[in-house]
A protein has these predicted regions:
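Short, solvent-exposed loop/beta-turn-alpha elements that line the ligand-binding surface or hinge
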Residues: 64, 122, 217-228, 294-304
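Sec/Tat signal peptide C-region and signal peptidase I cleavage site
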Residues: 30-34
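N-terminal secretory signal peptides
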Residues: 1-11, 21-25
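Secondary-structure end/capping motifs
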Residues: 242-319
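N-terminal secretory/targeting leader peptides
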Residues: 71-73, 79, 208-211, 233, ...
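Short, glycine-/small- and polar/acidic-enriched structural segments
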Residues: 35-167, 173-177, 185, 192-198, ...
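Conserved C-terminal helix/tail region of periplasmic/extracytoplasmic solute-binding proteins
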Residues: 311-333
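Pocket-lining segment of extracytoplasmic ligand-binding domains
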Residues: 97, 181-273
Length: 333
């Protein structure tokens, strides 16, 4: 079993390996590091798990490496994947649903490589069910026959329906709704609960309108262990981009790894960079729980196994038309 403390703290050696490709360029004179390479278009959607990417942008890590990175904001992870499929995007930031990415892999085998995931669980929270502050709903089982909203796309809806089923909440109806509307829909009484991702739960809690029913739900109900790492989101680059720009790709991943390192070692400094990229602002950023992060060179066999178990849910349910092996999708330097 993967220990969350282990997957939260990378060894210095692994971080140095991930960052090694960027050392030479970061030491080069500014004139050498001028942004002359290709534009790197990275899709994201407004969830807290994208923090290493937001931090790397705002701290100037990409610019320091001489990279021209363009963040592309989408309403959901499905659109991020579609942009990669159509050639309008070169990769994804953390938080982009790994099941959404897998659908792209099925449509176009060899589409992308994952260089960083954001494992979450009951300790490192990203996923949760929330309800109105004064609601009578106390447990997941209380959602029996209720109206539940989930984030958009096949990953969110499949997980939401499966978790409700496994928690004994039979007869619940699930509706897709952008996560930015989850708190408002609960306040307006349009739904009884939402399966959502941070920072939504924090926003509702801090403005006194919603509360969490249960957090870290995917690890518990899908993977069978509240402390299991759910590799539900990932930073990736398209294989086409990597092949055309191998050195630029290494520099990009090295600069991105600096964002991961900042989140790991200085979370309070990093949190502020959610502002402008997610729906959370100002002092509220200090309240958001953070997911963990795992770089491509930090995966252990147990991590691959839990990641595979997550993917197998979608093939077992017929959402994926075939089994998608995880290991070949992980970037190799």
């Amino acid at each position: 079993m993967s220990n969350p403390e282990q997957f939260h703290r990378a060894s210095r050696r692994q971080l140095l390996q991930a960052g090694a490709a960027g050392v030479a360029v970061l030491a080069a004179p500014a004139i050498v590091r001028a942004q002359t390479g290709p534009k790197i278009r990275i899709g994201f959607w407004p969830v807290a798990a994208g923090l290493p990417f937001f931090a790397a942008l705002e701290k100037g890590y990409f610019k320091e490496a001489g990279l021209d990175v363009e963040p592309l904001k989408f309403a959901g992870a499905q659109q991020v994947m579609e942009a990669m499929l159509s050639g309008r995007g070169d990769g994804s930031a953390n938080g982009t649903g790994t099941a959404n990415l897998a659908i792209g892999e099925i449509a176009q085998p060899g589409l992308f490589k994952i260089f960083c995931t954001n494992p979450s669980n009951v300790k490192y929270v990203l996923d949760e069910f929330i309800t109105g502050k004064d609601s009578a709903i106390k447990t997941m089982a209380d959602l029996k026959g209720k109206r539940v909203a989930s984030g958009p796309g096949i990953q969110n809806t499949t997980l939401c329906k499966t978790m409700l089923e496994r928690a004994g909440a039979t007869g619940a109806t699930v509706t897709e709704l952008p996560i930015g509307q989850h708190v408002a829909s609960l306040v307006a009484g349009q739904v009884d609960a939402c399966y959502t991702l941070e920072p939504t739960g924090t926003i509702g809690r801090m403005n006194g309108t919603t509360r969490v029913i249960e957090a870290g739900v995917v690890a518990k109900y899908i993977l069978g262990d509240p402390m299991a790492p759910w590799h539900g989101g990932a930073g990736s680059l398209t294989t086409e981009f990597i092949k055309k720009n191998p050195e630029v790709s290494k520099k990009f991943i090295a600069a991105y790894a600096r964002g991961v390192e900042l989140v790991r070692t200085k979370p309070d400094e990093a949190r502020q960079f959610m502002k402008g990229y997610t729906a959370i602002e100002g002092p509220l950023t200090a309240e958001v729980p953070l997911a963990s992060y795992m770089l491509y060179n930090e995966f252990k066999p147990s991590d691959i196994a839990y990641f595979q178990k997550f993917y197998d849910l979608f093939s077992d349910k017929g959402i994926f038309e075939k089994k998608v092996p995880v290991e070949p999708l992980i970037y190799k330097a």
